[in-house]
Curated annotation (Swiss-Prot):
This is Elongation factor Tu. Residues 19-26 are annotated as: G1. GO terms for cellular component: cytosol. Residues 173-175 are annotated as: G5. Residues 10-203 form the tr-type G domain.
């Protein structure tokens, strides 16, 4: 059978299900595919099929994630569901599956539980733009309890800086919908309408300001210095002014040539592997680990706060805890930089398998903005992963 061409007639959005263990995330994922399949907008995926999620490696960390796709009348969705709690934490912190929004699943029978809180906090820390809530198992919950659960949820969302009063909360039963109950199926359609309307359409990488991490540098005699790398976002054109940022002093220059696969282009865009030729840049002024960016859009920093996950021994991480002033390498985009870790007040040590907020001071500045992902390494071996949550200086 020939592969169907990917139609780009609808906006594409990445979402995922989050929430406490056994509250019905995977059942809901299966129910969405089953209800949308009836409308001809998805392929039905069985619960067991989603639950046996394949393992993937992202920044040296193994994560189990199930990928499902479906569409509504308005959009095309890629949906991720993780079987285990640790997989969620790793997924959100490494950005393995960058989410444009998430469906928070809460069982009406239990209300918010510890992992509910933890997932909301993580969603805030790693900047998931919007959440929609599915209050599940309402068929077996006490109606008076449901009202309390909804109030409690709105307070919890507000506590973590989400607009708790405005977030849509849809009540339903994922299991009943999966069994084909008409009322329950209606709630799933209502949920998808809320996701369509409430989760904002993401800005495409190509529409963001230009940025390319430098992977390699070489000189072409008589022509100048070339930096190569994969363009992360935006578009660059010949004769445009750019800045070289990070590690060394920031330098303005002009792109005098763009090459891709030995072809000369007049522009490069997000996703392209390109070589950029710079005017008046010496080979000693640019190196791997710097970025080329639209002037004024990114700045170099050494001190930041981050949310990190530290690998367990079984995951190939450290075998022992680390303490304040731990000095590993932080791998940003294309290079390792040594940094010192400051643990939060009252935390004496960090055990393999922990996730927490830390403060880091790097020995050289790196071009960064909030939300930048990194790996934590010791001698080239990954021992953790993180996301920049706040820049200090």
């Amino acid at each position: 059978m020939a592969k169907e061409a990917y139609k780009r007639d609808k906006p594409h959005v990445n979402i995922g299900t989050i929430g406490h263990v056994d509250h019905g995330k995977t059942t809901l994922t299966a129910a969405i595919t089953s209800v949308l399949a009836k409308a001809g907008n998805a392929e039905m995926r069985e619960f067991g099929d989603i639950d046996k999620a394949p393992e993937e490696r992202e920044r040296g960390i193994t994560i189990s994630t199930a990928h499902v796709e479906y569409q509504t009348e308005k959009r095309h969705y890629a949906h991720i569901d993780c079987p285990g709690h640790a997989d969620y934490i790793k997924n959100m912190i490494t950005g393995a599956a960058q989410m444009d929004g998430a469906i928070l699943v809460v069982a009406g029978t239990d209300g918010p539980m510890p992992q509910t809180r933890e997932h909301i906090l993580l969603a805030r820390q790693v900047n998931v733009p919007a959440l929609v809530v599915f209050l599940n198992k309402v068929d077996i919950a006490d109606p008076e309890l449901l009202e309390l659960v909804e109030l409690e949820l709105r307070e919890l969302l507000t506590e973590y800086d989400f607009p708790g009063d405005d977030i849509p909360i849809i009540k339903g039963s994922a299991l009943k919908a999966l069994e084909g109950d008409a009322e329950a199926e209606k709630a799933i359609m209502e949920l998808m309408d809320a996701v369509d309307d409430y989760i904002p359409e993401p800005v495409r990488d190509v529409d963001k300001p230009f940025l390319m991490p430098v992977e390699d540098v070489f000189s072409i005699s008589g022509r100048g210095t070339v930096g190569t790398g994969r363009i992360e976002r935006g578009v660059v054109k010949i004769n445009e002014e750019v800045e070289l940022v990070g590690i060394k002093p920031t330098k303005k220059t002009v792109v005098t040539g763009i090459e891709m696969f030995q072809k000369i282009l007049d522009q490069g865009q997000a996703g392209d592997n390109a070589g950029l030729l710079f005017r008046g840049v010496g080979k000693d002024e640019i190196e791997r680990g710097m970025v080329v960016a639209k002037p004024g859009t990114i700045t170099p920093h050494t001190k930041f706060k981050a949310e990190v996950y530290i690998l367990k021994k079984e995951e190939g991480g450290r075998h022992t805890p680390f303490f304040n002033n731990y000095r590993p390498q932080f791998y940003f985009r294309t290079t390792d930089v040594t940094g010192a870790v400051t643990l939060p007040e009252g935390v004496e040590m960090v055990m393999p398998g922990d996730n927490l907020s830390i403060e880091v001071e790097l020995i050289v500045p790196i071009a960064m903005d909030e939300n930048l992902r990194f790996a934590i390494r010791e001698g080239g071996r990954t021992v953790g992963a993180g996301t920049v949550t706040q820049i200090i200086e």
